[in-house]
Regions:
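Short acidic (Asp/Glu) and glycine-rich catalytic loops that position anionic groups and cofactors
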Residues: 65-66, 103-107, 149-158
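Core active-site phosphate/anionic-ligand binding loop and the adjoining beta-turn-alpha structural block
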Residues: 6-74, 80, 87, 91
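Short, small-residue-biased leader/transition segments that mark boundaries at the very start
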Residues: 2-4
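Glycine-rich phosphate/pyrophosphate-binding beta-alpha loops
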Residues: 89-122
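Gly/Pro-rich interdomain helix-loop hinge
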Residues: 113-116, 120-168
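Glycine-rich flexible loops
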Residues: 38-44, 49, 85, 109, ...
Length: 168
C-alpha cells in the first residue's frame, strides 16, 4: 500500500536559503510565487481556518504582493528572495493547519495531465475557484458570506478598496 498522507511525512524543519534559488528562471519564479499565493488564499478561506492561520496567510499574501514582482525583475535580490521564502513558509504553516481547497486538487490533476507547472495551473484556475467559493447554494450561504468577507479583506490588503464584497 502507498500512503498518500501521514504525519510522519511532515518535515521537522525548513531551510530558507535565498541563495539557492537565485538561478531559477523567471517562469519558475513566477509559477512558484503563484503557488505560494494560492496556498495562502486557500488556507485563508478553508474550513479549518482560525486566527493563527489567517494571520500567517495574510502576511504571506502581503509579502507575495510586494516581493514577487521584485524577484521576477531582479532575481539576484537576496532580500526580496528571503521575503518570498518567508511568504512560502508562512503560507505552508497556514495551509498545513487550515487545509487547502478545490484549487489545489484540480491544479495537481491539470498540471500532471497537461504537463503544466503546478503554480501556473493554480494561477489558471484561481479566478474560477474564487468565484465558485464566493457564490453558491443557499445551504452554503453562511460559509460563503464568510468567504466573500475574507476575499474583500484580501482585496483591501492589495489596495483594491472601493469594491463590494461581491466584486472583490
Amino acid at each position: 500500500d502507498v500512503c498518500s498522507s501521514d504525519l510522519e511525512l511532515l518535515p521537522d524543519a525548513a531551510v530558507l536559503d535565498a541563495g539557492l534559488v537565485c538561478s531559477a528562471p523567471p517562469g519558475v519564479t513566477a509559477a512558484t510565487g503563484m503557488d505560494v499565493m494560492t496556498h495562502a488564499l486557500e488556507a485563508y478561506v478553508a474550513a479549518g481556518a482560525n486566527d493563527f492561520t489567517d494571520a500567517a496567510a495574510e502576511k504571506a499574501l502581503l509579502l507575495v504582493k510586494e516581493y514577487l514582482p521584485e524577484v521576477y525583475r531582479s532575481p539576484l535580490d537576496l532580500y526580496a528572495r528571503e521575503r518570498m521564502h518567508n511568504a512560502s513558509c508562512l503560507a505552508g504553516m497556514a495551509f498545513s493547519n487550515a487545509g487547502l481547497g478545490l484549487n489545489h486538487g484540480m491544479a495537481h490533476t491539470l498540471g500532471q495531465h497537461f504537463h503544466i507547472p503546478h503554480g501556473t495551473a493554480n494561477a489558471m484556475l484561481l479566478p474560477w475557484v474564487l468565484a465558485f467559493n464566493a457564490f453558491g447554494s443557499k445551504a452554503r450561504e453562511k460559509r460563503i458570506n464568510q468567504t466573500t468577507e475574507k476575499y474583500a479583506r484580501i482585496a483591501a490588503l492589495y489596495g483594491m478598496d472601493g469594491f463590494s464584497k461581491e466584486e472583490s
